[in-house]
C-alpha cells in the first residue's frame, strides 16, 4: 500500500508539472537577435564586433543568437509561447523584422517584442547595460521596467545606464524596431563588447547563460 501511494504521488506530481507546462501564455514573446550571424565562417554584418582582444573577438550578432536560442529553449520547456523573429543567420532588414512582428501581433493580439543586443562605444571605458523603448509614455515602459528590475538583481556589480527624466529608468530612442512595431517593444543592450572586461564576460558561456536566465526570469514574472 505504501509503495502504491508513493507511486500515485509520483504520477500526480508528473501530471501537475505537465499541466503547468501546458498553461496558456498571457503573451506571445517575439524574440529578435539583433544583426546577422555567421554563415560558412563569414560574419553577416559589417562592424558590430569587438576589437581583436588577446582573449578573443566578440561578434555581436552571434552572441545575440546564443542568448535568444537559450531563451527559446527555456520558453519551450515551460510552455511559454515564444517565437524567433528571424530564425536565420542572415542579417534580416529592420523593415522585415518589424513586418514579421506586426503580422504576428495582428494574428495573436498579445505579443511583446524583445530585441537582444549588446552595446559599443568609441571609448573602451564605456560599460553597463540599458533597455530602450520608443519615445513617450507607452505600454512598453512597464515591460522595460520589469526587465530592468531583474537585471539589477542579476548584475548588481554592473552599471545600469538609465534615463530618469520621464520618471522611469528605461532610455528612449527612435530605433526603427521600437518606433514601428505595433505591440509593446523593448531593445536590451547587454553590456559593451568594446569594453575589454565586459567583452571577455560576453564570450563566456556561463555569463551568456546568466543573461538568458535573467531575461527569462523577467518573462516568467510577467507570465504569472
Explain the meaning of each model-derived region.
Residues 17-98:
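Active-site histidine-acidic residue metal-binding/catalytic motifs
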